[in-house]
Every structure is written in C-alpha cells, then in structure tokens.
C-alpha cells in the first residue's frame, strides 16, 4: 500500500525566556509582521504591567499599535474584538496577559490568518505556548484551534510579579500531562486513536521535570518562574507535534471543565486540573498519592471544601465529565459513573 500519511506542524520561531527580555518584542515583530500595523489584546491590569511597554516600544519603531482591552475569554468578547478590528489592516496580533487574554489573541490571529506573538504575564497554564484556545459559552469551555505563537516572549522579571497562586497553578497544569498521556494511550489501545510517541514523551518529560524539582518552586523566586515556564513551553510544543491537545488534556481537564460548567468560579484552571489529576491517576490505578503530595508542596489544596464547593457539585462533575467531549475517550469511559463509585473515589482521594 502506498504511504500517504501527512502532517503539518507549526512551532514558535522566536522564543525569549528570562530576565528583562520584553524589549525583544521589537525584533520578533520586525521579523514576522506583514506590515507596520499591530494589534495588542490585553486586560486592564496586564496592559499596565507589560502591554503599555510593548505599545511604546513598537510605536517608537514606527508601528501603528491598536489596543483592545478584553475581559473574560468567551465568544462574546471574541466577536466584539473581531468586529471592532475589521477595518484594521493588521500585520500581527500580540497577546499580553494571562491565559484568557492570550487565548483571545491566538483565536483572533487564527481567524484573521495573522502571525501571533504570546507575551505572558503569568505562568498560569500551558495555553501561553500552545495552538489551542479555550473559550467559554454559557459557562462551558470549548477547546478551539488557535494560532501557534510565531514568537513567545516570557519575561520572568514581569511574571514574578503575579501572585504565587498563578505559578503553582501553572506547575499543576504541566503535571496534569501525566494523566492526559495515560488517557491518550488508553484511547490509542482501546479505540485506535492516532498516537504520537514523540509528543507523548515530550509532554511526560515536561511534567516529570516539574515533579522532580517541586521543592525548588518557591514564592518570590524568579528562578521558579523560569523552571515552570520553560516546561509550559515544552508542553505547548508537544501539542504542536500532536496536532491536538491530547498531550496536555485528558480526563483531568474534562473534570475541570465540568466544574466550570457547574458554576465554579473561584478556582484557577490549574487548581481544577490538580484536583482532576489526582482522581484520574486514582482511576488509572497509578501513584496518585505522589501527585497529591506534589500539589501539597506547591500549596495547592485538592479538597473541594477549601474552595467552598459543595460535595454534590464535585460528585456530579466526576460522574458526567465524560460528556463534555464525548469524542475524547478517557479513563472516565463513555457513560455516567455510578453515584457510589464517584463518592468512593472522591472520598478515598480526599477531594470530598
């Protein structure tokens, strides 16, 4: 049989990570923008933290910079930005902020077929360097194809200013790759889903790097931001190799999205994934205790009551999480988990 397999992979061309690297935005935009018009998508706080400097640097070099300050990463916000930017003949889109602002920017860039540059202000999750965008509608998160960053500028001197909680959540999101890859292997074995061993290996490597150095992740340490961010970048690259989010999104992310759909709003994405990873590793009959201990060391609680979440919400989220993306097979199976089984798993792992 004639070999016909084909795949396209897009990777960041320019990656700057470290202390005071923000000024390299001029180099990255200069090499990749199609003209002298740039769009910045940011938020009120993150614009003051880094976006204004990006604006001023590019303006100094003759760029016409158009700034859009956005709220939550949902379809209404995306549609507003896309409508308001219709008349701008932009040559590049720059996302400055946390995960939500960067997701909006990468989706805008994808829809407009423009180069995209990611400038994260917090190492809160692996979306800062992946080609996937998470957008919400009616409280439910949907994973959309977005633009893979042509450039990433992760200035640790800026990112260290974010609350430690965001750093811990970013580390947890990378560690969650372990359960995601186990789900991917399961889907490959039972459902014949296409599997990339190289993408899986990179994803697992980034998770193990964080896990093995968990005690080095500390508050107010710029080196800790460096450690987590470089593995976030590796995790995003794994998704680019796979051509989908499988290397970093499995049952633990379905559980997190089920919590979001239930109206849980006072948890960060990485914190929800931490909770989901522990339960997923338990269901896979893996060493969930080691993962839970790592989250304890990060200062992340996986007890739902610590976030003011009622037990029934968590139980229902676990039972129905499989339905969030029914086409994505995981350890959660294809039908609702029994009530008693969900309670047993959640109680044994200490989540409820």
Curated annotation (Swiss-Prot):
Substrate binds at residues 126, 173, 257. Its EC number is 1.1.1.261. It catalyses: sn-glycerol 1-phosphate + NAD(+) = dihydroxyacetone phosphate + NADH + H(+); sn-glycerol 1-phosphate + NADP(+) = dihydroxyacetone phosphate + NADPH + H(+). Pathway: Membrane lipid metabolism; glycerophospholipid metabolism. Binds 1 zinc ion per subunit. Its cofactor is Zn(2+). It comes from the Archaea. InterPro entries: G1P_dehydrogenase_arc, G1PDH, Glycerol_DH. NAD(+) binds at residues 99-103, 121-124, 130. GO terms for cellular component: cytoplasm. GO terms for biological process: glycerophospholipid metabolic process; phospholipid biosynthetic process. It is found in: Cytoplasm. Catalyzes the NAD(P)H-dependent reduction of dihydroxyacetonephosphate (DHAP or glycerone phosphate) to glycerol 1-phosphate (G1P). The G1P thus generated is used as the glycerophosphate backbone of phospholipids in the cellular membranes of Archaea. GO terms for molecular function: glycerol-1-phosphate dehydrogenase (NAD+) activity; glycerol-1-phosphate dehydrogenase (NADP+) activity; metal ion binding. Zn(2+) binds at residues 173, 253, 269. The keyword NAD applies. This is Glycerol-1-phosphate dehydrogenase [NAD(P)+]. SUPFAM superfamilies: Dehydroquinate synthase-like. Belongs to the glycerol-1-phosphate dehydrogenase family. It is an enzyme of class 1 (oxidoreductase). Keywords: Cytoplasm, Lipid biosynthesis, Lipid metabolism, Metal-binding, NAD, NADP, Oxidoreductase, Phospholipid biosynthesis, Phospholipid metabolism, Zinc.
């Amino acid at each position: 049989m004639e070999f016909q397999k084909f795949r396209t992979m897009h990777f960041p061309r320019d990656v700057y990570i470290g202390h005071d690297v923000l000024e390299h935005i001029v180099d990255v935009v200069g090499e990749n923008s199609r003209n002298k018009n740039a769009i910045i998508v940011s938020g009120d706080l993150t614009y003051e933290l880094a976006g204004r400097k990006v604006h001023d640097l590019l303006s100094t070099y003759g760029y016409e910079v158009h700034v859009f300050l956005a709220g939550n990463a949902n379809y209404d916000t995306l549609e507003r930005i896309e409508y308001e930017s219709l008349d701008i003949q932009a040559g590049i889109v720059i996302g400055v902020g946390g995960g939500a602002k960067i997701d909006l920017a990468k989706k805008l860039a994808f829809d407009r077929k423009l180069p995209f540059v990611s400038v994260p202000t917090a190492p809160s999750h692996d979306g800062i360097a992946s080609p996937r965008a998470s957008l919400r509608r009616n409280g439910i998160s949907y994973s959309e194809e977005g633009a893979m960053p042509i450039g990433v500028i992760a200035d640790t001197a800026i990112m260290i200013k974010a609350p430690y909680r965001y750093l811990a959540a970013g580390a947890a999101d990378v560690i969650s790759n372990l359960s995601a890859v186990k789900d991917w292997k399961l889907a490959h074995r039972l459902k014949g889903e296409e599997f990339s061993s190289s993408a899986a290996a990179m994803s697992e490597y980034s998770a193990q790097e964080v896990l093995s150095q968990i005690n080095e992740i500390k508050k107010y340490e710029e080196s800790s931001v460096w450690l987590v961010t470089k593995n976030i970048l590796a995790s995003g690259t794994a998704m680019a190799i796979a051509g989908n989010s499988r290397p970093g999104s499995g049952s633990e992310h379905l559980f997190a999205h089920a919590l979001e759909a239930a109206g849980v709003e006072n948890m960060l994405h990485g914190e929800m994934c931490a909770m989901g990873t522990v339960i997923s590793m338990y269901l896979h009959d893996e060493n969930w205790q080691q993962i839970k201990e790592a989250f304890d060391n990060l200062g992340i609680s996986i007890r739902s009551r610590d976030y003011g979440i009622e037990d029934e919400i968590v139980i229902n989220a676990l039972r129905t999480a499989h339905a969030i993306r029914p086409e994505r097979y995981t350890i959660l199976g294809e039908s609702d988990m029994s009530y008693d089984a969900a309670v047993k798993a959640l109680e044994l792992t200490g989540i409820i």
